[in-house]
Amino acid sequence: MKKLKIALLQICPCNTLDENLKKGIEFCRKAKERGADIALFPEMWSNGYNIYERPVHAWLAEAIDADSDFVNAFGKLARELDMAIGITFLEKYADSARNTMILFDRFGDNKFTYAKVHTCDFSVESNLTPGEDFYTAELDTHCGMVRIGAMICFDREFPESARILMLRGAEVILVPNACPMEINRLSQLRGRAYENMTAIATCNYPASVPDCNGASTVFDGVAYLPHDMDCSRDTCILQADGSEGIFVAELDLEQLRRYRSSEVHGNAFRRPEKYSALTETKINEPFIRLDRRK
């Protein structure tokens, strides 16, 4: 089996929706030229996650429909290029907006629409409507069928996000991002991949974008190889620098599947009957926050 090629579009946003559309299309075409099976954008590409230091009404006015020309253009492009695309945008949603990603398969079909569940309610994202759930879907690629899931930026701070996606069969988790990927956040991703035996691909904005630093990554989730079980390996198969560009990782699906079928993590030895505290909703000190969404 050929390796699954995931292209992380670590690129700078422009000033308008139309400019971001044109640049997004340009870089998807470049990703296809490099053999990508999946192209992933950073968080909220439609407006470059430009929601800070601005009046809330100004950036909420930039929300677009999930069925907008901007979004549909990437569905058509996915079909033209024979390449899956994870496009991100500020979605108009009822009287509010959501932080959303749509995964189009290589035939241009919408496999799922995911809205960020863990909105940053301690900041301006408190004005967004959170997503309702985590989703996975079977993605038809040139490597065969692959079950894909997604979470967005702050979602990765919570182990439950990746855990639920693993329980729903995700082999690969796509993570659009817009924040500094420093050592602790990178360690989170490494841990999520390790404990779930799941590949995790994160696409961030480059260092030229305020409060971002590039460092997009792919962790393949395989901590040990069959012929070398005494020595662990680094699961990071790609880490970008801070520059703008397309960073392509080649994921060995056969290796990942062999590992998942025999190793001890993921759902192999869990004891969910012991985890009832995870679903309790009462919050005690020191974790009470007045700005937490009810």
Give the location of each predicted region:
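Short polar catalytic/cofactor-binding loops
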Residues: 10-17
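Active-site catalytic loop in hydrolytic enzyme cores
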Residues: 66, 92-168, 176-177, 181-191, ...
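Cys-nucleophile CN-hydrolase/nitrilase-fold catalytic domain and related Cys-dependent amidase chemistry
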Residues: 17, 26-113, 179-196
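CN hydrolase (nitrilase-like) catalytic-core segments centered on the catalytic cysteine
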Residues: 66-84, 156-247
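C-terminal beta-strand edge segments of enzyme domains
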Residues: 206-294
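Extreme N-terminal starter segment of soluble prokaryotic enzymes
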Residues: 1-7
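Conserved hydrophobic/aromatic positions in well-ordered beta-strands
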Residues: 7, 102-104, 112, 217-219, ...
